[in-house]
Amino acid sequence: MSKLNSVLPAIAPHCIDMWEHFPTLRDLDANCTSVVEMGVRGGCSAYALAAGLERSSSKDKWMLYLDINDCRNPKLEELASEAGIKIEFRQTDSRYVELPECSLLFIDTLHTYGQLKTELDLHHTKAKDFIVMHDTDAPWGYKNEVDDGSPNRGLWPAIEEFLDDHKATWRLLKRYRNCHGLTILVRV
């Protein structure tokens, strides 16, 4: 077992809203060459994404993880580098950053309709294969984490609108309802 994969069971107890999605993220990411993660918090999903990227057959694997707060994780960076993954952290607001093209875009930022709608509108063209979003079911699927002034509430309406507006390019691959929800969109 790789070092990145061996960390997942150890951090799972600290990731109660995410740990059940570790295998899904790891397996999905194994088919990718690059990942951009928006919204890092404690780094739970970042470890799972890096563990999947490590399995990729690509020789040029990279990961960019960003958050509005300083969530840089030196241990993650060390393990990812040892696994042959170029990794970078940026402290920035996901609504005001130019992202590079990537295989997989992972979104777990502020849980409001307005935030997710803006992020999807701005960044969906950068994801070449998948867009993955966490917290798409209870409690944030249908209510906002904070009042953002938008008429709609929660992440799920933003996803439904996005899919309606982008039928020619994106479709729902899978919606998990456990651990606050995980939604995977795949490029058509």
Regions found by a protein language model. Name each.
Residues 1-188:
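A short alpha-helical cap/connector motif
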